[in-house]
A protein has these predicted regions:
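N-terminal basic, Ser/Thr-rich segments that initiate or prime the first beta/alpha elements at protein or domain
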Residues: 1-458
Length: 458
């Protein structure tokens, strides 16, 4: 059993966390424009950086990994005391190999191992050379005669989202430019006519443009996130074997996920207004503490055969409306309160600060859409038993989650307030291996009792 060194990128997380330690004093000196102190700060930062590099070199020297003849992965740490962690392939619920662009340029891969039943914080993440990461993955979770599929729905869905975001961000940018041009020149005599405090005069001058630029920045960041998602869906491939299901893809960065089918906690089909429009449905799979941010695959309407081949045990919740009699109105609180506040501010700004009205309409419409989603959840969220499977539907923002439970080891927790007990309703929380929780709100108590009876008999 030969011990090997980790990739030097292992210390990137340590260096990133300590970056503020030696940059904060430098920024303070630059703002003060004290050039004498700047040279002193640069020398101090250089010494501190050398010290951190020495610590990083020590971390790399005392840490190593190995793979023995029986296929057990060992991670070693020797600094005063010896710590070893060992994982067999049978102990894993899933593994992921992530290679962002910077990692690809350095020939590195981030290998994350998800033990069965372990929470997200107890996963094992190591940075290895590309060939070593692939060898460890093939040893722990080998692919035996995989059946490959290349669904094209994910790329088009991501491209559709990206195009819509680009148009909306462009509109926000144009609005921000117009608001900036409309900012009046700073004339104390003019602003003195406004019989309010200095803070109110400052808000009257800068708030419309500042709010518009803030919305434009939020749209740009969302676009960057969608661009990253689109880049990861290029050349996307899904496979399944007798005991695994997984996917890989990416353009600038590569991502690979392998999931043991016997350890899948639940599968989630997320329905959004955009998904309904394009008729492409993303499917997410959770196994243990592994909940990838990317869908396992995206299928189009008419390609249900591929869905059934990849996840033959999945059962979609029935297309029924939930019982809404005596249901709690708490569904509307998270979106209704900010919607009412934004609507009130919009009405007030129409008379007090008209330049801000158009900008305030954007968050008002946004929270209005969330309120419409809450209304859909009020009518659709519920629990059903279907063909020997527990299925549920829950609303989160604009997404309607259609979930089928796979894993038998699930904890059901029913919580009732006095008001809910009086009307025969309760909140049900499902806790899966890895401490992943799903909550269904204000469901009839008899439906929850059916779930409990099903768990006792199965």
């Amino acid at each position: 059993m030969n011990e090997r060194r980790l990739h030097p990128f292992t210390v990137l997380r340590f260096l990133r966390k300590t970056l503020v330690v030696y940059l904060l004093p430098l920024v303070q000196v630059l703002f003060e424009r004290n050039w004498t102190a700047l040279h002193t700060a640069l020398r101090q930062d250089a010494l501190l950086f050398l010290l951190l590099c020495t610590v990083s070199w020590g971390i790399l020297r005392v840490s190593s990994w190995s793979l023995d003849d029986t296929g057990v992965f060992h991670l070693h740490w020797r600094l005063g005391i010896r710590l070893d962690r060992a994982l067999r392939g049978e102990m894993l619920a899933a593994l992921t190999i992530d290679r962002p662009l910077l990692y690809r340029m350095a020939g590195a891969s981030r290998l994350t191992l998800y033990p069965v039943g372990a929470a997200q914080k107890h996963t094992l993440s190591v940075c290895l050379p590309k060939a070593d990461a692939e060898a460890v993955a093939d040893q722990l979770m080998p692919l035996v005669k995989p059946a490959l599929h290349r669904p094209a729905g994910g790329e088009r869905a991501a491209l559709g989202f990206l195009g819509a975001n680009g148009l909306s961000t462009l509109a926000l940018f144009v609005l921000a430019v117009r608001q900036t041009r409309d900012v009046p020149d700073w004339n104390p005599a003019v602003f003195a006519q406004i019989q309010v405090s200095f803070l109110a005069r400052f808000a009257a001058r800068w708030l419309p443009a500042g709010a518009a630029w803030l919305l434009a920045a939020a749209g740009f960041l969302l676009g960057a996130s969608l661009m990253r998602s689109f880049a990861q869906t290029v050349h996307y491939t899904v496979w399944h074997t007798a005991d695994q299901i997984g996917s890989r893809g990416g353009w600038l960065g590569h991502f690979e996920c392998r999931v043991r089918t016997s350890e899948i906690s639940f599968a989630d089909v997320r329905i959004s207004p955009a998904a309904r429009l394009m008729k492409r449905w993303p499917v997410f799979v959770t196994a243990g503490g592994c909940s990838p941010e990317l869908p396992l695959f995206v299928y189009r309407s008419g390609e249900e055969a591929l869905f059934r081949e990849l996840l033959p045990e999945f059962r979609m919740p029935p297309d029924l409306l939930a019982r809404t009699e005596q249901r709690s109105l708490i569904f509307f609180a998270p979106a209704g309160i900010p919607f009412a506040l934004c609507l009130l501010l919009t009405l007030v700004s129409a008379t007090v600060l008209p330049q801000l009205t158009v900008t305030l309409l954007i968050p008002t419409f946004f929270f209005g859409a969330l309120l419409a989603g809450a209304a859909a959840g009020y009518r659709r969220e519920g629990l059903w038993l279907r063909e020997g499977r527990m299925t549920l539907r829950r609303q989160q923002g604009l997404y309607l989650h259609c979930i089928c439970v796979f894993h038998p080891d699930v904890c059901l927790t029913a919580a009732q307030s006095p008001w809910a007990a009086s009307v025969g309703r309760t909140n049900l929380t499902l806790t899966f291996p890895g401490w992943v929780k799903l909550k269904v709100r204000s469901v009839p108590l008899r439906d929850v009792e059916n779930f409990f009876s099903f768990m006792e008999t199965n």
